[in-house]
Every structure is written in structure tokens, then in C-alpha cells.
Amino acid sequence: SKYRKVYDSQGQRMSGPYIITSSNPNELPDILANQKIADTIQVLHKDSKSYRVYSIMNDEKLKKLIIDELGLQENQVSVNYTKLFIPEFF
């Protein structure tokens, strides 16, 4: 992926997956419109209520970046680790 060079050069791996949600489900912020945020994530899935992403940041740093860049209050957005279900194929 295009992120491979970034996290290899930093000695880090992608973290996550994380679910990013808004406290108001009708007002999910457009995090991809912000280049600083977009450069730190890889979107796995987006719907009207959440984003599922991998990030080169941990959940706390990613949440702080989103809050700072989009001018949100801490209670307006959440970033939570989640497990992805990947079925086994035989």
C-alpha cells in the first residue's frame, strides 16, 4: 500500500482497525476532506454513520488530530479499536 513506506521508515506498523463515529450520527465529519488526517489513515469502509480505518497513529493520537484539525469538541467524535471478522476459506 502507499502507506508502507511511511510506517516502515518510522519503524511503525499500521494500527487498528478503528471505528470513527460522531456523537451525532447525522453529522459525521468529512475526515477525508482534511489532507493531514487523510495522510494518516487507510479507509477500509465508510458509511453514513462511521469510518473503519487503519492508521499510522494510535487511537488517542488519531482522535486528537481529528479534533484539532476539524475544530471539534472531544465529545463530538470517538475513535475505538475494533476487531474485523475475516472468515476462513478452505
PLM region descriptions:
Residues 1-8:
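N-terminal signal-anchor transmembrane alpha helix of single-pass membrane proteins
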Residues 15-40:
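Short amphipathic alpha-helix segments
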Residues 17-21, 50-54, 76-78:
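Ordered hydrophobic segments in well-structured contexts
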Residues 21-25, 56, 82:
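Structural motif
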Residues 26-32, 59-61, 85-88:
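Short, surface-exposed beta-strand/loop "edge" segments at domain boundaries and coil↔beta transitions
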Residues 40-46, 72-90:
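Conserved short beta-strand edge segments in small beta-sheet-based binding/regulatory domains
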Residues 43-74:
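Short, intrinsically disordered low-complexity segments
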